């Protein structure tokens, strides 16, 4: 799904780094998978994959399963990890993350 945008080796390393519950940190993950240095267009493509229901927003249930976008066998995020991730990205407080919020969160 991420072919041409992200390297498989980077995805594997990033997933390995947050395999244990409670170890997912979105900033570190975005850096490890090589997303931080990508163009806005590439980030938008990644957002489109994560936005499973194509609502133009990533909601809490999609964030919980965030890692599974990168590998079907990856774990779900814990409720605490999901809440932290949502809070970090949801700058307007509407309970979901839009593409501009997602881009801002990655670019940090």
UniProtKB/Swiss-Prot annotation:
The keyword Cell membrane does not apply. CDD domains: EFh_parvalbumin_beta. InterPro entries: EF-hand-dom_pair, EF_Hand_1_Ca_BS, EF_hand_dom, Parvalbumin. One of its GO terms (cellular component) is cytoplasm. Keywords: Acetylation, Allergen, Calcium, Metal-binding, Muscle protein, Repeat. Ca(2+) 2 binds at residues 90, 92, 94, 96, 101. Ca(2+) 1 binds at residues 51, 53, 55, 57, 59, 62. The modification N-acetylalanine is found at residue 1. Residues 38-73, 77-108 form the EF-hand domain. Gene3D superfamilies: EF-hand. GO terms for molecular function: calcium ion binding. Pfam families: EF-hand_7. In muscle, parvalbumin is thought to be involved in relaxation after contraction. It binds two calcium ions. Is regarded as an important allergen. On the 2D-gel the determined pI of this protein is: 4.51, its MW is: 11.37 kDa. Belongs to the parvalbumin family. PANTHER family: PARVALBUMIN, PARVALBUMIN ALPHA. This is Parvalbumin beta 1. It comes from Merluccius productus (North Pacific hake). The lineage of its organism: Eukaryota, Metazoa, Chordata, Craniata, Vertebrata.
